[in-house]
Amino acid sequence: MHLLGPWLLLLVLEYLAFSDSSKWVFEHPETLYAWEGACVWIPCTYRALDGDLESFILFHNPEYNKNTSKFDGTRLYESTKDGKVPSEQKRVQFLGDKNKNCTLSIHPVHLNDSGQLGLRMESKTEKWMERIHLNVSERPFPPHIQLPPEIQESQEVTLTCLLNFSCYGYPIQLQWLLEGVPMRQAAVTSTSLTIKSVFTRSELKFSPQWSHHGKIVTCQLQDADGKFLSNDTVQLNVKHTPKLEIKVTPSDAIVREGDSVTMTCEVSSSNPEYTTVSWLKDGTSLKKQNTFTLNLREVTKDQSGKYCCQVSNDVGPGRSEEVFLQVQYAPEPSTVQILHSPAVEGSQVEFLCMSLANPLPTNYTWYHNGKEMQGRTEEKVHIPKILPWHAGTYSCVAENILGTGQRGPGAELDVQYPPKKVTTVIQNPMPIREGDTVTLSCNYNSSNPSVTRYEWKPHGAWEEPSLGVLKIQNVGWDNTTIACAACNSWCSWASPVALNVQYAPRDVRVRKIKPLSEIHSGNSVSLQCDFSSSHPKEVQFFWEKNGRLLGKESQLNFDSISPEDAGSYSCWVNNSIGQTASKAWTLEVLYAPRRLRVSMSPGDQVMEGKSATLTCESDANPPVSHYTWFDWNNQSLPYHSQKLRLEPVKVQHSGAYWCQGTNSVGKGRSPLSTLTVYYSPETIGRRVAVGLGSCLAILILAICGLKLQRRWKRTQSQQGLQENSSGQSFFVRNKKVRRAPLSEGPHSLGCYNPMMEDGISYTTLRFPEMNIPRTGDAESSEMQRPPPDCDDTVTYSALHKRQVGDYENVIPDFPEDEGIHYSELIQFGVGERPQAQENVDYVILKH
């Protein structure tokens, strides 16, 4: 128990001195390196959980004093409440703060600063001592070079130079050297001043070659002025394939056939050591050649080529530079190479003479189809413009200092050209007529390549029964020329050949030469028979009108055209092939109205009350456009159409009429035409009744006075009449023979009317017996009259004078009398006459 007491006390004191470590956390590098005169930068962080830092002391090699319960040692830095720093503490700077940063800087640092630095930290309730190791050397310590595990030639590697020192107040630089010479590659330098590490590092990337093997690489530490401070060196171990060199006897490697050649392979470097040896010619390994010496005895031209030796190690095979062995020999049989073959006519061609020879040929002899080409001694022959005769076989002979070669088989030059001398040949017998079948062939003289097709122009729906033959069915008149082309890769056209097709005249037509305007009656007219073409050109003309031959000249002339010359004209043109008719051409003659006449419908005699139509008929071209009507007095009537319609027609309308027609050419008039209008039966009856009534009244008075005196005469007269008559009643209308028509000239008496002539009208008055009824019409009276043997009849006649007033458009000079004269015809019946009544019936006739 007595032994444990002091130790327990020591532990308690230690605990009190260091407080609770779980409440303080520090981060900083464990060891820092520097050298005399340099500086030290101590990056440091801390965390005090119970409050801010109140006191900080930096000790050098601190030791805890148990007696005083404090740390003893050299105080390099101590913070004071008034902020004053002792003079000896100026090289040490506390760069931290009161809660987390405890960074320090010592500048300059001395050798005796090596050891342990103690950071005494105190807060209000806690205390802590943190220790940091400082290693200060007398001289600058060297950097350390780091190499990759293996270095191979031509593979990029990174060399690293590391120095465990860095301080803001003391700049340094790291320099790379190869065999004491600064390296050209740029290095990348970096520094670290963190709580984890403090260093300066330089990295260099380069691709080592086999020649770098065994070379010394140096990393040199320099101050800011480039002054050497220290360095580190390493020897490069570059793995590489064997590096070889060939030696040849003879040294120029030029021999003639039959000579001997020796080649020796020497290894200048290999890392690691080589294992196998081989020889190659033109990239191909030579069999059974596994030594460093290659002996070639009695070489031939085939042994010419590129030789090299190959030695292998664990890295790979290494090859020497190639040695070109030239075995000289005379030219071999030559061959000809033709550039641009087959050649097109007109293009350029180049010939190349190829002959294996060593040395190269210096002179050439050229042959065309076995004949030497004079002046051609070069390796190449150039023809700027090739022609068909250049085609053929070309060969050559080469010559060098060792001899002359032999002529090879040669090369064939194919000169291609379009078909030559192409012609179109007509196979038909001449001449060719329109509608014939024509056969043509396309011929040519030569062609290379052969003709494969033919073309024809103009194009048409024609038949090609065989290649180069054209058959034209039903040849047209206008097939003037035909041309053909023979084609291979190109087409050559022949000159057009004229078919000279003979045909009948074409496009025959009638053309009016004069007059240039409309044709009027009386004009001089010329018609021309035209046609567009005819082959042969000798032609004849024929004129036709309505199928009647007129003439045989090319022109048809009318000195004075008349309407009768109008009609449909056509002309014919013929040659030895045939004839062609023109289309019918209508000759139209314009003339004034002529041959006018007035036609009447239904006739020239019309009963009053009916209708009469007078038509003015004419012959005119152009047709009549205007009509004018005139009466017998040349008075113009207010009618201007072709037809004059009278409805109802009156007796006053009787007379002579004429018409006049007008067109754009002129006028024409018709002769007089007479219209006769006669009375209707009703009018005649009325007028006869009136006339007879008047006559009867006068006659009765006369009869009464002369009754007895003339009784016997009437009896005798009546008996005479009975002997010659059937005793029937009758009415006589004397028709007067029509007068000769008046002259064509107009007259003042109007139109002749036969009804207006002097005439005698008869009527019979019948006196019936007593108590027998009487009718007023003639027909009933006739049917009811007694037999002739018992009928007493008196026949009266009325003579009418012609009156001037009966003519239209004529006014009488003085009043006229009735112009009626009466007479009596007495018919005595057979037997005794019955007692008659005393009354008398009258018939009066009036116009």
From Swiss-Prot:
Keywords: Cell adhesion, Cell membrane, Disulfide bond, Glycoprotein, Immunoglobulin domain, Isopeptide bond, Lectin, Membrane, Phosphoprotein, Repeat, Signal, Transmembrane, Transmembrane helix. Residues 20-687 are extracellular. CDD domains: IgC1_CD22_d2, IgC2_CD22_d3, IgV_CD22_d1. The modification Phosphotyrosine is found at Y762, Y807, Y822, Y842. One of its GO terms (biological process) is regulation of endocytosis. Phosphorylation of Tyr-762, Tyr-807 and Tyr-822 are involved in binding to SYK, GRB2 and SYK, respectively. Phosphorylation of Tyr-842 is involved in binding to SYK, PLCG2 and PIK3R1/PIK3R2. B-lymphocytes. Residues 143-235, 242-326, 331-416, 419-500, 505-582, 593-676 form the Ig-like C2-type domain. Glycans are attached at N67, N101, N112, N135, N164, N231, N363, N445, N479, N574, N634. The keyword Glycoprotein applies. One of its GO terms (cellular component) is early endosome. It is a single-pass type I membrane protein. A motif (ITIM motif 4) lies at residues 840-845. Residues 707-847 are cytoplasmic. Disulfide bonds join C39-C167, C44-C102, C161-C219, C265-C309, C353-C396, C442-C484, C529-C571, C616-C659. N-acetylneuraminate binds at R120. It comes from the Eukaryota. Belongs to the immunoglobulin superfamily. SIGLEC (sialic acid binding Ig-like lectin) family. Predominantly monomer of isoform CD22-beta. Also found as heterodimer of isoform CD22-beta and a shorter isoform. Interacts with PTPN6/SHP-1, LYN, SYK, PIK3R1/PIK3R2 and PLCG1 upon phosphorylation. Interacts with GRB2, INPP5D and SHC1 upon phosphorylation. May form a complex with INPP5D/SHIP, GRB2 and SHC1. Contains 4 copies of a cytoplasmic motif that is referred to as the immunoreceptor tyrosine-based inhibitor motif (ITIM). This motif is involved in modulation of cellular responses. The phosphorylated ITIM motif can bind the SH2 domain of several SH2-containing phosphatases. Most highly expressed siglec (sialic acid-binding immunoglobulin-like lectin) on B-cells that plays a role in various aspects of B-cell biology including differentiation, antigen presentation, and trafficking to bone marrow. Binds to alpha 2,6-linked sialic acid residues of surface molecules such as CD22 itself, CD45 and IgM in a cis configuration. Can also bind to ligands on other cells as an adhesion molecule in a trans configuration. This is B-cell receptor CD22. It comes from Homo sapiens.
